[in-house]
């Protein structure tokens, strides 16, 4: 199985470090056949990566489960017609407070995109904003994303 993550920037953020660790471990344990990280921008990142990192223009060649980590990335990812199972990872810390456009985007996410919350606090915030539920990840692992 192929698992990819789409992030805005390759950088040393808490979320990115978790993603790097998840993909590295999944490859070592043979939980996935291929791991990919797609990005829009590159920043300094000293983390070891045992998976491919590609500019977002290469998303058109990807097939598998794609986890999108920011609302601003969904429009591009949603236009891809390959065999992609799209998952949006909602993390309260990535939302811009007071951004009405982002809130409307959150409410109108396509019903074909599965939404998962990073933690319980994010799940409560997602429900408060949208009136919809977004299950919490039991653990941040490849198996959790692949079984969606």
PLM regions and their residue ranges:
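Hydrophobic, Leu/Ile/Phe/Ala-enriched alpha-helical segments that form helix-helix packing faces
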Residues: 22-30, 73-78, 126-130
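A structural motif corresponding to the C-terminal end of an alpha-helix
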Residues: 29-30, 108-113
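A short, active-site helix/loop in glycosyltransferases that binds the activated sugar's phosphate group
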Residues: 76-77, 99, 111-136, 143-146
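Extended catalytic core of nucleotide-activated donor transferases of GT-like folds
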Residues: 41-110
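Short internal beta-strands
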Residues: 34-41, 87-89, 115-118
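N-terminal pre-catalytic "stem/leader" segment of glycosyltransferase-like enzymes
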Residues: 1-62, 135-148
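A structural signal for well-ordered alpha-helical scaffolds and beta->alpha junctions
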Residues: 19, 70, 119-120
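Short, glycine/serine-rich, charged loops/turns that create anion-binding
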Residues: 10-11, 93, 120
